[in-house]
């Protein structure tokens, strides 16, 4: 039953974010903000597919242990694409609120992203085994969490300052995604049931993507 539910949920998620992302790109009408948002959604869905597709196959066939290599490789790829996702989201923020300068913030985004990717590439992560050490899960997620926190603060402040109702909950979607993700990193191997938190985490990312799509539709409708 769990295998069927997870598989159907993952299919729904991937189809949703990829289709919405493609629509954003195709219907952006040259808007850099919405083009970035579209590519952000495509990167999210494409990256997650490397992990979710093998997971669905594993759950519906011989089990997760039999797909250790594929699942580990998928997590490895996803860890990098999620970093790219937040870099793109940072540039959505710059485009939407017409941000000029602020080189220190940009350098912070690049530094945290680079640190995250470098840590993800370390062999100590043991991605391709069933025994990825918790310590390295924490190390590689520290710069990722700081990157997420930075983006949360940027969107919270800017949406409030500009009275941006379309993006007023963007910061919350990121808070929720990390709030559901961190317990899985810390206790997923010890308390397997915490893995279920990845479902609401995924829903938070769908909300993120839909915020961008709804904003595009509303702005173009208003222009017409």
Language-model segments: which ranges?
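Membrane-helix boundary elements
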Residues: 111-138, 155-159
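Internal transmembrane alpha-helix with an interfacial aromatic "cap," most often the third helix
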Residues: 21-27, 50-67, 72-106, 120-122, ...
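Hydrophobic alpha-helical transmembrane segments of multi-pass membrane proteins
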Residues: 39-57, 114-116, 172-185
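Non-cytosolic membrane-interface motifs at loop->transmembrane helix junctions
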Residues: 3-5, 63-75, 129-142, 191-201
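Terminal transmembrane helical module of multi-pass membrane proteins
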Residues: 171-217
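Membrane-interface helix-boundary motifs at transmembrane edges
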Residues: 26-37, 93-105, 130-133, 156-168, ...
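Alpha-helical transmembrane segments in multipass membrane proteins, preferentially the mid-helix core
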Residues: 16-26, 87-93, 118-123, 142-168, ...
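Hydrophobic transmembrane alpha-helical segments in integral membrane proteins
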Residues: 1-19
